[in-house]
């Protein structure tokens, strides 16, 4: 067997144990579905040469804007940009945000080449303002490129993709932050056990999730990252969410019940990812990732758009230049003790609730709209205080000191659309919870995808009034991204509707479903 034909940028001694060359030498399929299966199965992962051919083909087929820099551009500009500096001393572009170049079994020449390529990309893409994932992408592509110019061209095609439905890498601080928020939403939905652990061991769980791209682009060992990148080039950005969720699931499985290795869970997760080979193989990691029944691409795109809108409304679109990624002031705003007051829950309990709500709403402080101590027990007054606000959080304290509540995604004014009859409304983002005697969140088990469909009138059902309750809300202009969505497929029109309110009762729940 002939040894792999590594290029001059690769440390051959390290590569022999990182990625073998034992597989097939050619790929003949052209159908997307077959490519997906082969990528997930690692068909070209066993052949260093074949992987290079596949990358060349897949990147060549990326639809790009008309003027996209190619290898000839690199040859023209690299001398002017680098000058007489040695490659090792070249500064990294500002858009990588002090992200270090992963070694990925590159030799010193290869690491210097990555710096040169990044600087030339910065010269040709002035619109790319924040892209900490790019050093890892360039370092991997350099393995499978004949020279620096070819690697530059491949990276440029990834950045220049003009297919709006095919997002590849975040290129602005706004896109990066909204992706972090979207990942937090997905963790909240699909990794509840891990999320509960994160809430328990970290002061700000959102800071932990803001590190998710670093797990993939930098901390994962080369053989793992290459397998992820194989599938990423075929299937796109959603794969990154899947793998990051799988990493968090494995971290929870290994570390649950064990003391953390440091007082910083972010550092513990990074260390876990670096040594992930001790826990799971690349095959098992991808198997776990694709076993998650994730939202569709369209649904994730809607969630991403809603998170971007929330950031824009907060005026958060660019990163403060003086703050590094590891020390930057995170945009997520926790519940501040000085600005929060409730007769039912304290700041710690409200922060627990805030860790469950969609991240675009966790940007804001809760605002007290209604309290039975202040406003009495009139439902009319309750509706008057809450109308025009969404979402709201309902808190109830019983005479036995038990505390429960619900996160309600939709404006209570929706109840007026039923012509005086009682009817259910709401979206699949709603949930109920208990804080005393123990903390527990309950989801609506029927819901697989949130949607607002046509309300369905039901017969009135009365519920006894509670001794004390209050409602907190976000600004009225923060609408759920699913309010205008009509494309989700649900078995029943009423399965995402479980808010109802009339003149004599208020109902959270639905006779057709179950809270668990």
Swiss-Prot record:
Entry protein name: TBC1 domain family member 24
UniProt note: domains: The Rab-GAP TBC domain is essential for phosphatidylinositol binding.
Location within or outside the cell: Cell membrane; Cytoplasm; Cytoplasmic vesicle membrane; Presynapse
Organism listed in the record: Bos taurus (Bovine)
Function: May act as a GTPase-activating protein for Rab family protein(s). Involved in neuronal projections development, probably through a negative modulation of ARF6 function. Involved in the regulation of synaptic vesicle trafficking.
Protein keywords: Cell membrane, Cell projection, Cytoplasm, Cytoplasmic vesicle, GTPase activation, Membrane, Phosphoprotein, Synapse
Residues annotated with Phosphoserine modification: 473, 480
One Pfam family matching this protein: RabGAP-TBC
Region of interest (Disordered), ranges: 456-476
Membrane topology category: Peripheral membrane protein
Superkingdom in the source lineage: Eukaryota
Quaternary structure and interacting proteins, as annotated: Interacts with ARF6.
GO cellular component, one term: cell projection
Classification lineage: Eukaryota, Metazoa, Chordata, Craniata, Vertebrata
GO molecular function term, any single one: GTPase activator activity
Domain TLDc residues, every copy: 343-516
Binding residues annotated for a 1,2-diacyl-sn-glycero-3-phospho-(1D-myo-inositol), in chain numbering: 36, 40, 238, 242, 293-297
SUPFAM superfamilies: Ypt/Rab-GAP domain of gyp1p
Listed SMART domains: TBC, TLDc
Domain Rab-GAP TBC positions: 34-236
InterPro entries: Rab-GAP-TBC_dom, Rab-GAP_TBC_sf, TLDc_dom
């Amino acid at each position: 067997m002939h040894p792999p034909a590594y290029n001059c940028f690769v440390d051959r001694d390290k590569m022999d144990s990182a990625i073998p060359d034992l597989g097939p030498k050619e790929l003949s399929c052209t159908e997307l579905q077959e490519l997906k299966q082969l990528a997930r199965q690692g068909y070209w992962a066993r052949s260093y040469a074949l992987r290079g051919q596949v990358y060349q083909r897949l990147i060549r087929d990326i639809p790009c804007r008309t003027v996209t820099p190619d290898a000839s551009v690199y040859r023209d500009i690299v001398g002017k940009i680098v000058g007489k500096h040695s490659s090792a001393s070249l500064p990294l572009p500002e858009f990588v945000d002090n992200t270090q170049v992963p070694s990925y079994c590159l030799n010193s020449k290869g690491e210097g080449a990555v710096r040169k390529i990044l600087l030339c990309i910065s010269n040709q893409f002035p619109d790319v303002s924040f892209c900490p994932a790019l050093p890892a992408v360039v370092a991997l592509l350099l393995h499978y490129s004949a020279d620096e110019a070819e690697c530059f061209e491949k990276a440029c095609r990834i950045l220049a993709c003009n297919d709006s439905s095919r997002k590849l890498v975040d290129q602005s601080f706004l896109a990066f932050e909204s992706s972090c928020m979207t990942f937090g939403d997905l963790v909240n939905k699909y990794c509840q056990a891990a999320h509960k652990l994160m809430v328990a061991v970290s002061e700000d769980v959102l800071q932990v999730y803001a590190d998710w791209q670093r797990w993939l682009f930098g901390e994962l060992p080369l053989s793992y990252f290459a397998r992820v990148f194989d599938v990423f080039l075929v299937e796109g950005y959603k794969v990154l969410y899947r793998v990051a969720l799988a990493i968090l699931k494995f971290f929870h499985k290994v570390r649950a019940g064990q003391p953390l290795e440091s007082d910083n869970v972010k550092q513990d997760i990074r260390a876990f990812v670096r040594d992930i080979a001790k826990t799971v193989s690349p095959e098992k990691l991808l198997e776990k990732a694709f076993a998650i029944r994730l939202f569709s691409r369209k649904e994730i795109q809607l969630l991403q758009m809603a998170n971007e809108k929330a950031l824009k409304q907060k005026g958060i679109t660019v990163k403060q230049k003086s703050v590094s990624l590891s020390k930057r002031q995170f945009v997520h705003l926790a519940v501040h003790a000085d600005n929060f007051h409730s007769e039912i829950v304290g700041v710690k309990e409200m922060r627990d609730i805030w860790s469950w709500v969609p991240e675009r709403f966790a940007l804001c402080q809760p605002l007290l709209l209604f309290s039975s101590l202040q406003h009495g027990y009139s439902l009319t007054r309750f509706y008057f205080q809450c109308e025009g606000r969404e979402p709201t959080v309902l808190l109830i304290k019983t005479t036995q000191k038990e505390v429960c509540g619900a996160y309600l995604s939709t404006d209570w004014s929706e109840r007026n659309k039923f012509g005086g009859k009682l009817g259910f409304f709401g979206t699949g983002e709603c949930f109920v919870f208990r804080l005393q005697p123990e903390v527990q969140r309950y989801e609506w088990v029927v819901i697989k995808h949130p949607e607002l469909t046509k309300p369905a009138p039901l017969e009135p059902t009365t519920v006894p009034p509670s001794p004390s309750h209050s409602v907190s809300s976000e600004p009225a202009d923060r609408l759920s991204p699913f309010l205008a969505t009509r494309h989700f497929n649900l078995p029943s029109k009423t399965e995402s509707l479980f808010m109802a309110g009339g003149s004599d009762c208020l109902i959270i729940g639905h006779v057709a479903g179950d809270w668990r």
